[in-house]
């Protein structure tokens, strides 16, 4: 199967750079799968796991918080606010963050920033999904 170059970049570092057969990410309209020779595309990404299929059934998963994905020729670039590989994730901290966000959303504080609590919950859920 043909391959494409994939890079996942944050403001701090290059999180992943390598060859892949497919990239699966969550855009605003749902999951999108990119394979070699895909038409050019730029799309915003939601906070969610990104899966990079490297060869056969091997896969690299990471938790990505926001950003954009650009597809040009045989290159996919993900520019993300944050991107964490499973080994970078503190599972206990992610569980605590999920619990805090869920508590905030159910208790309805008067000055609650609902969008912020929802984003925190999405980040925690993505981290926990990737760390499995």
Swiss-Prot record:
Membrane topology, as annotated: Peripheral membrane protein
GO cellular component, one term: plasma membrane
Keyword terms, alphabetized: ATP synthesis, Cell membrane, CF(1), Hydrogen ion transport, Ion transport, Membrane, Transport
Pfam families: ATP-synt_DE, ATP-synt_DE_N
Keyword Cell membrane: yes
Subcellular location: Cell membrane
A molecular-function term among this protein's GO annotations: proton-transporting ATP synthase activity, rotational mechanism
InterPro entries listed in its UniProt record: ATP_F1_dsu/esu_C_sf, ATP_synth_F1_dsu/esu, ATP_synth_F1_dsu/esu_N, ATP_synth_F1_esu_C, ATPsynth_dsu/esu_N
CDD domains: F1-ATPase_delta
Gene3D superfamilies given in the database record: ATP synthase delta/epsilon subunit, C-terminal domain (1.20.5.440), F0F1 ATP synthase delta/epsilon subunit, N-terminal (2.60.15.10)
Function description: Produces ATP from ADP in the presence of a proton gradient across the membrane.
Protein family according to the UniProt entry: Belongs to the ATPase epsilon chain family.
NCBIfam families: ATP_synt_epsi (TIGR01216), PRK00571.1-3 (NF001846), PRK13442.1 (NF009977), PRK13446.1 (NF009980)
SUBUNIT field: F-type ATPases have 2 components, CF(1) - the catalytic core - and CF(0) - the membrane proton channel. CF(1) has five subunits: alpha(3), beta(3), gamma(1), delta(1), epsilon(1). CF(0) has three main subunits: a, b and c.
Protein name: ATP synthase epsilon chain
